[in-house]
Amino acid sequence: DAARINFKNKEQKKQLAHLLKLRIVDLDKKLKNKKRRAVRLKKYIAPDTKIKIMELKIEGISSNKVYKRFYPENGPVAHVVGFTGSDGKGQEGIERVMNKTLAGEKGRKINLIDNKYTDGKRTPRVIGQFQSIKLPKDGEDIKLTIDLRLQNEAYNALKKAVEKHEALSGSAVLLDAKTGEVLAMTNYPSFNPNGYNKAGDFIRNRVVTDVFEPGSTMKPISIAASLEKNIVNKNTLIDTGKGAYKYEGKLIHDTKAHGVIAVKDVIKVSSNIGSAKISEKISSINLATMYKKFGYGKKTGINFPGEVSGILRKHTKWRKIDHSRVSYGYGMNSTLIQSAQAYTVFANKGELKPISLIKGKDEKISKRVLSPKITKDILTMLESVTDNDGGTAPKARVYGYRVAGKTGTSWKINPITKEYFKDKYIGSFIGLGPVSNPKFVMEIMIDDPLADKGYSGGTLAGPVFSKVMTKAFEWYSVDADGLELEEIKNKKEVYADKRKL
């Protein structure tokens, strides 16, 4: 109350300004108009600060208790949970999607009041309840599918990779391959939802809002389309030449010459030329149809704010070179969550799993996309990608387990010239395991690393996959199925014997 404010001395005013983190000149401005009966000196203060202010015993100062969300798990889960605004309404993340469920409903009642006031406050005195119109309803609890252990593990591994390679950012998503539940979804850099006004561009959940050309992670799908139509088989030989192939006046490059290789090795060595030559044999409508079956060009249905569908142009608008480039993941774009969901097909004998972020939501039905036989062939090819002998992602290997996956390395597009940068890349890896009975699917993307420190998907994202999967297999007690199986069994037996002693 500006009219009643009365400082005993200058020191008292100085102490108040200090506690409110205001300059004295700004405090004076707020209190200048003595006709204003209610002046807000500070919107939010901590409870201990309020106590110190009230201990000053300055006449005319009062406070109101305000309940505000506090997020103890901030950085790693900030993009998933989101935050509420000053009005208590959800602004981002699950807070926004489930705001109505979390908030509950206010009640309404009619009271009898008189025109007297109590304790000097401008609040009418209630002398009796007349009628209750609507009872209040408490908000409901929401349980997410997120496993905080894996969320933190993924965040820390991602942070390490981004910092090591001096990249702009990184994102990761981990799915339960059998249920489609999102076990981890994180980005780095992140932000603190308790101070979201300082988040800037990093406030977006880039797993669902940002698109990029997926690159070579599309090769297993385009090759699966050709296998399904019996255009080629896994042993069909493809001449990839000396690492450069001119098609429709454009050069298609491989990182090195691979010569004549079988279809199954096109994925292992990630040959753009091999993928392009295989795609020449399949119609655009069949290739586009297969991509759509895998979920590209539409939202996943995760129901998260800002999710985009990505771009998969109509096949009727593809030129021959567009058809070729789409086979190895250029000329289209997708989100991380789309691609991760797509690879649930390879983990489930050809069925695409619907994904979810909230426990207890209505279960959706899986969709048949590939035959079990073709899926098995592709899964074998994906496992070869992690081979030490010629695979593009040996760094994704997990001790004691057979894992499979595909690397992706794509150039970034200059938003001004619409041309590709020659020194800016996006590196990604989509992996699943264990191969004998896939339990997890995970995709990692590292954006704009320092090229001198390595920019391929296998180098950037492979180690993140390996680190997180090692913990996931351990925490979920997944049986080992790798070549080191006997060694692991022996170690467990030795450990058990020591415990007996």
Predicted regions located by residue number:
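Solvent-exposed, polar/charged alpha-helical surfaces in well-ordered, non-transmembrane soluble domains
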Residues: 10-14, 18, 25, 29, ...
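Small/polar-residue-rich segments within soluble enzyme cores
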Residues: 11-18, 29-138, 444
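Beta-lactam-recognizing serine transpeptidase/beta-lactamase-like catalytic domain environment
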Residues: 118-133, 146, 172-216, 221-448, ...
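Short, gly/Ser/Thr-rich active-site loops of penicillin-recognizing serine hydrolases
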Residues: 366, 462-501
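Conserved, well-ordered alpha-helix/loop/beta-strand core segments that scaffold catalytic motifs
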Residues: 38, 127-170
